[in-house]
Regions:
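Interdomain "pre-motor" coupling segment immediately N-terminal to P-loop NTPase/helicase cores
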Residues: 16, 21-78
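N-terminal pre-P-loop "Q-motif" helix
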Residues: 92-107
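P-loop (Walker A) phosphate-binding loop of NTP-binding proteins
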Residues: 105, 116, 146, 319
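Pre-Walker A (Motif I) flank of P-loop NTPase domains
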Residues: 107-113
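Conserved helicase motor core of SF1/SF2 NTP-dependent helicases
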Residues: 112, 123, 127, 131, ...
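Conserved glycine(s) of the Walker
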Residues: 120
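Conserved helicase motor core of P-loop NTPases
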Residues: 225-370, 380-382, 511-512
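C-terminal accessory regions
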Residues: 375-514
């Protein structure tokens, strides 16, 4: 956080608790306390930024490791013949940028692939993997993603069934669990590591990831920097791209569904600030002027969509969690009364203020050994056990679990959820309210993230002017991180030590050479 912002917010919050004006604090008093905290090492000051010590250490160590990897000599592989054979056998024709992304993965030990939905990222990954298998039959490959749903989707789309979550692949718990952990973990044995949805990775997770990569391993980071940034501290993916030291390939040609996907085109338009969207059966807008009316329309549309496609393929995504009839929590209660009404007390269980029923659609809200935060499933039974109620859950094939009452605190109803919670997931159909009441939350990246969760159909319900407002609002709140600047600083230091020309110096040499 910026020093000035921190001091102003601290002064405001503290003085709100002091009813007598004469006793209220002055700005200089807050500044003096902050300076004392800096001198004691309770916070870290870098330029105009104030860090918690652990966050500064994470940013600094991650920057140092990335810079060392960028300076580390990479042995470019000659893949031309293998690549041509793979393309022929897979029956794919790569665009020039897709081919550049494949080559970058073999010319550098760290590279980035970005692009909106439908631009062929999956085809590139499948090609990279197949080339690698041909070049290194005994090489170890690891695919990872921040969420369970994203890792399973990665496995399905690439045909590589060993994709894991970053937490699982790195053997992590939560950041809170990590505070007391002192044992240094061994580097991963993988020779090629591909991480999808990297825009979701925060500073803590990035620190853990880069600390576990062995020398010589190739890393490919894949993601969409125009989606919402990570929930936790940092803006890692954007900083890696903007530092201009990591090779980045931007895929911008739409391929999905033979170029017939309105979702892919409209995602591109929204990203460009263009309000002239295409509408049709797979991208619909239904007008509604208020939350109560919108909620009725959402419920009606939801019932129609689940009848057509199945309840596990349709998701309502709301900008708001709890405020108003079109918020995720209130929609959950209303929809449940329609699609899964009360039958008997034996089929219900109350956990605090939450009530769950047999056949409810639910979401896991915490990582465990068997399920990940954001995983969706259904309640299959509620029964009496020796030590209280037992609840049977179905999270998909091979992931049928039984929870105790204590475990149930990590579940939410999930007929509807927030756009933030949907990050890393995909659904056949997405239904999304867009109302004036949601204006405070609606920015271009939130809208873009919501519609790009859908594979086949988007249904927007609300006010057109709110949709246009969201498309035009691109004032993304700045995250005060210096990761990119620190990568640049360490890279220059390591490059000079190794006698490697810096990028700008290399450009000057080429210019002088004619």
């Amino acid at each position: 956080m910026l020093r000035e912002t921190l001091q102003k917010e601290a002064l405001r919050l503290l003085n709100n608790k002091i009813p007598v004006p004469a006793l209220r604090l002055q700005a200089q008093e807050v500044a003096d306390v902050l300076q004392d905290m800096i001198l004691k090492g309770e916070v870290v000051a870098v330029k105009d930024n104030i860090y918690l010590p652990r966050v500064f250490a994470q940013e600094d160590e991650t920057a140092r490791r990335i810079a060392m990897r960028l300076v580390e000599p990479s042995e470019p592989e000659r893949i031309e013949r293998v690549l041509e054979r793979v393309k022929r056998e897979m029956g794919v024709v790569l665009s020039s940028k897709q081919e550049a992304a494949v080559y970058a993965a073999y010319r550098h030990n760290l590279s980035i692939i970005t692009g909106s939905p439908g631009t062929g990222k999956t085809t590139v990954l499948k090609t990279i993997l197949e080339v690698y298998r041909r070049l290194y039959p005994d090489g170890q490959i690891v695919l990872m993603a921040p969420t369970g749903r994203a890792s399973r989707r990665m496995a399905e789309s690439t045909g590589f069934d060993m994709a894991r979550t970053l937490h699982s692949g790195l053997g992590l718990g939560s950041e809170e669990d990590d505070v007391n952990r002192t044992k240094q973990q061994e580097p991963l044995s993988a020779d090629l590591i591909i991480v999808d949805e990297f825009s979701m990775v925060d500073m803590w997770l990035a620190d853990k990831f880069f600390s576990r990569i062995k020398d010589g391993a190739r890393i490919v980071l894949v993601g969409d920097p125009d989606q919402l940034p990570s929930v936790g501290a940092g803006n890692v993916f954007r900083e890696l791209i903007d530092c201009e030291l990591v090779p980045v390939t931007v895929l911008d040609q739409i391929f999905r569904q033979s170029k017939d996907s309105l979702i892919a085109y409209n995602a591109k338009f929204i990203n460009e600030g263009n309000t002239k969207l295409y509408y049709g059966p797979d991208f619909m807008f239904m007008a509604s002027d208020n939350q109560a009316d919108a909620a009725e329309r959402i419920i009606s549309r939801y019932c129609r969509e689940i009848e057509e496609s199945g309840i596990d393929r349709v998701q309502i995504l709301s900008p708001f969690r709890s405020e108003g009839a079109a918020s995720a929590e209130q929609l959950n209660e209303a929809i449940r009364e329609v699609v899964n009404p009360f039958r008997s007390a034996e089929d219900e269980i109350k956990i605090g203020v939450k009530v769950f029923r047999v056949n409810d659609r639910i979401m896991q809200t915490k990582n465990t050994a068997k399920v990940s935060n954001g995983d969706l499933g259904f309640i299959r039974y509620i029964k009496d056990g020796e030590n209280g109620k037992r609840v049977g859950l179905d999270f998909g094939v091979g992931r049928e679990l039984e929870y105790s009452v204590e475990d149930m605190v990590n579940l939410d109803l999930a007929y509807a959820t927030t756009i933030h919670k949907s990050m890393g997931s995909e659904y056949e159909t997405v239904i999304m309210p867009l109302l004036k009441a949601h204006s405070i939350m609606l920015y271009r990246n939130l809208l873009y993230t919501g519609i790009t969760r859908a594979k086949k159909r988007v249904v927007l319900i609300g006010q057109k002017q709110v949709l246009f407002m969201a498309i035009h609002r691109n004032e993304i709140s700045k995250r005060n991180t210096l990761l990119g600047a620190r990568i640049d600083m360490y890279f220059k230091a390591y490059a000079r030590r190794a006698g490697i020309p810096l990028p700008n110096e290399a450009k000057k040499e080429l210019k002088h050479a004619g």
